[in-house]
Amino acid sequence: MLRVKSVFCRYRRQARHVSSGEELAAGVYDTVVIGGGVTGTALLFLLSKFTNLKKLAILERRSDFALVASHGKNNSQTIHCGDIETNYSFEKAKFIKRYADLLRNYLCHLPAEKREGISSVTQKMVLGVGEKECSFLEERYPVFRKLFKPMKLYGKSDIHSVEPRVVLKNENTLREETLAALYMPPELTTCDYQKLSNSFVECARSMNGVDSKKISINLNTEVTNIEEANESLYIIHTNRGFIKSRFVVVCACGHSLMIAQKMNYGLEYSCLPVAGSFYFSGNVLNGKVYTIQNPALPFAAVHGDPDIIEKGKTRFGPTALPLPLLERDNMNTLVDFLKVWNPDLSLFHVYFNLFKDMTMLKYVCRNFLFEIPILNKYLFLKDVRKIIPSLTTRDLSYCVGYGGVRPQLINKVSKKLILGEGKIDPGKNIIFNITPSPGATTCLGNGESDMNIICERLNGTVDRPAVRKFLYQGDYPVDYL
């Protein structure tokens, strides 16, 4: 008799209407992906197009794909490359650029009309204000230009030619501060990750029936229980029945950690959810303008971006507010947060080290104030004026219904806050992806890594020449590794 490890995996309060004996899909699947955001759908696309695995499925608890963290309202819509993100070292930028170029090459394979509906081409820059920041950019430029060939170092007059509102204090007067920028000419910079997710699903669905493949797409399907029958068989129970699989990949953002810990994996981690809010202004920028990140803070500095959803508006943000929720504006996820919080002395040691620094403490307190109506605009205006000095409070409006949650992991053993995407791989036929920023940008790179692991453990085959031709060659060739 098989020893069964049963795990209750609720990540939304909802009535269950299906008996545990009803089968959602017949037979044993090669891989089931749990979570239909951009990470999960990218993996489904890769497995369906580039492997010989025959039976694949994706389970998404909501009525459509990418309605949470991957929705365009819940992230900055940026394809992060490491060129204008000053918290990235050269090696980290090289790593991120590779993943960004995989994504951009995928987009370039789409018909022009579809690509333009998903993404947009704009210029971008990181702005330095004052002597210290300008010197920083001047030192950074010769190093990063080796990786980003089109990059240019701009002074005040050059910036004025591409982003006049950045340089003007008012209609007729230039701002007094010294200005410099690392400027990147127009390229694919912006992506609606919800539309991208649906594109991945369409591509995967088109493989249904090709070479006897079966691709099962399941919306409104919430996982309620996972049974680990043995190292190569999992029984996933949902509100619509159960499905069996040889391999499972959980791509449910912060809920991935909750599911993992219910299965006694990743117990060394806690979660620090960081919520981000945004503000709208009129159309004041021609492209993305980032500012230099404070090295003492693990959060992105405020930036301005032409919005891909609200055409004709510029979105400023994000703020960074620690919040005890795994999903913004979903109080049901408070209980879920408490499950992955796991407070102990090690965790409080991490908190103490984070907040004993006055810079961090002031930053967090200030971000709490950014959520207070009326007061928030006056406080946030100071940050925004670093980019557009002529803006007033009348020009800003709080983006109601915008802003997501980034589940930052804390390793309680090493007592460190982990920045960037996380993965829990216990070495069995199950993987858990926890993907805060820049997880959307890295969806195909992360998916390629998972695809290779899956095929290695299932004795499957990856068509590597096809992967290289499709993702590594094209308008954004990955020839710098």
Language model features: what each stretch is:
Residues 25, 389-481:
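C-terminal lid/capping helical subdomain adjacent to the catalytic/cofactor pocket in oxidative enzymes
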Residues 27-29, 237-247:
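Core beta-strand elements of the Rossmann-like FAD/NAD(P) dinucleotide-binding domain
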Residues 29-57:
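N-terminal Rossmann-like FAD-binding beta1-loop-alpha1 element of flavoenzymes
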Residues 45, 61, 79, 112-121, ...:
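Active-site substrate-recognition segment that forms the wall
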Residues 48-72:
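Glycine-rich FAD pyrophosphate-binding loop
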Residues 76-165, 323-325, 329-335:
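Dinucleotide-binding Rossmann-like beta1-alpha1 core, especially the glycine-rich loop
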Residues 91-100, 127-137, 182-205, 218, ...:
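Short beta-strand to alpha-helix junction loop
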Residues 120, 130-218, 225-229, 338-356:
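Flavin (FAD/FMN) cofactor-binding and adjacent substrate-gating region
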